[in-house]
């Protein structure tokens, strides 16, 4: 088992560090908008690319490698140092290039990311194939999702190079939604549906409903992309209804599976189930945004803060909650496998680490959830109060405080888990 840079744990810890640092940048830009003194726009793009590539994409890669290691597929393989370096160079190039508005840096970062896609995709597919619910339809579903990742990188390169200025708006829409809708959102839904039942030690409540979700979700996503490309709100709303019904079916199926498993509770399951709740909020909010623009002028004013609220319902409420759930599940098991060679002694050490990760889980999940809801509340308040209102500023600082509290708490628990070694005889695996 590999140790150091290139190991699954290194992907997870480095990805979490990227996410923390870029989250601070994002909160600073949000506060700047609310206070009427926006920070340079380059910082916003640094936040976006750093969080998505250095943070979320690296964490997803780490979770895939962790899954392979935990089922014994990676015990005799060397570390993934090349992928680790390439992914972090890609994040650094994209983030710094976005901040400095340097297209050459962005293109270099995009090239590193493009070169990392093949090994990254292979590990993700191999990891999900270990799930009992893997089917040919799941393989097709994941292939479509990974195509979205490839597409967003290629379209991002076209944008950075400014090679097709006439198509800039269309390319930008494709770049955004191929990555966010096809890869992150759709891929995460499929991953949760495949991974949650084994975590609960229970088969999926309805296999047929699960297959319907895998079939309809790409169709709804394709319809939504078509609506965006054609600037047709009616197509967007029709596709949105399809997505809402499909996602509701997925959530019902997973919640029923959890209920049949005896409603087990851990910080991992808490975050994953909360992510499902925000998944529905995200879709309903998107439908409301689409309905709002049917009026001319829009029925309710819609500006930068409202866009931030909508997108971060997805980023923090759904994606981050799900990734944190995976992180809380993987870290104790990785450390136990890495540090204890004895099969008899390993469970006791793993339970000790799980106890650390489960501490104050209600506070951790609640702070992250209510902090996200607070971001939605802030722009809603601007419909009735000015930005200078004490109501708005109170909601802003409360939301920021809750989010920072949750992130800080999780970081402290990860640090404590990494720093807790097994008592007695132990051996580190190389």
Model feature map: region roles:
Residues 1-430:
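Hydrophobic alpha-helical transmembrane segments of multi-pass integral membrane proteins
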């Amino acid at each position: 088992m590999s140790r150091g840079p290139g190991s699954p744990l290194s992907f997870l810890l480095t990805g979490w560090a990227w996410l923390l640092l870029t989250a601070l940048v994002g909160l600073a830009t949000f506060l700047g908008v609310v206070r009427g003194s926006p920070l340079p726009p380059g910082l916003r793009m640094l936040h976006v690319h750093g969080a998505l590539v250095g943070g979320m994409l690296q964490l997803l890669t780490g979770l895939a490698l962790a899954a392979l290691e935990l089922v014994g597929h990676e015990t005799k393989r060397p570390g993934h140092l090349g992928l680790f370096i390439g992914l972090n160079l890609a994040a650094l190039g994209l983030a710094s290039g976005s901040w400095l508005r340097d297209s050459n840096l962005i293109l270099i970062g995009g090239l590193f990311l493009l070169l990392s896609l093949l090994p990254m995709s292979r590990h993700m597919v191999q990891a999900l194939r270990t799930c009992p619910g893997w089917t040919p339809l799941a393989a097709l579903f994941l292939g479509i999702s990974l195509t979205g990742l490839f597409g967003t990188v290629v379209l991002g390169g076209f944008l950075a190079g400014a090679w097709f200025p006439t198509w800039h708006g269309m390319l930008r829409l494709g770049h955004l939604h191929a990555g966010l809708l096809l890869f992150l959102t759709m891929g995460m839904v499929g991953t949760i549906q495949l991974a949650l039942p084994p975590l609960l030690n229970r088969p999926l409540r309805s296999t047929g409903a699960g297959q319907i979700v895998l079939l309809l979700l790409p169709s709804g996503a394709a319809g939504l992309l078509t609506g965006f490309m054609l600037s047709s709100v009616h197509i967007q709303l029709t596709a949105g209804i399809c997505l809402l019904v499909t996602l509701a079916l997925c959530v019902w199926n997973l919640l029923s599976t959890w209920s049949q498993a005896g409603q087990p509770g851990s910080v991992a399951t808490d975050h994953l189930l909360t992510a499902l709740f925000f998944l529905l909020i995200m879709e309903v909010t998107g439908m409301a945004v689409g309905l709002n623009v049917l009026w001319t002028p829009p029925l309710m004013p819609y500006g930068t803060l409202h866009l931030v609220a909508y997108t971060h319902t997805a980023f923090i409420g759904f994606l981050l909650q799900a990734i944190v759930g995976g992180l809380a599940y993987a870290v104790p098991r990785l450390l136990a496998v890495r540090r204890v060679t004895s099969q008899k002694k390993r469970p006791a050490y793993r339970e000790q680490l799980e106890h650390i990760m489960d501490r104050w889980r209600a506070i951790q999940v609640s702070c992250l959830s209510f902090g996200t809801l607070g971001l939605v509340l802030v722009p809603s308040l601007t419909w009735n109060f000015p930005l200078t209102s004490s109501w708005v500023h109170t909601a802003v600082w409360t939301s920021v405080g809750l989010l920072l509290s949750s992130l800080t708490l999780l970081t402290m628990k990860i640090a404590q888990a990494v720093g807790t070694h097994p008592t007695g005889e132990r051996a580190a695996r190389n």
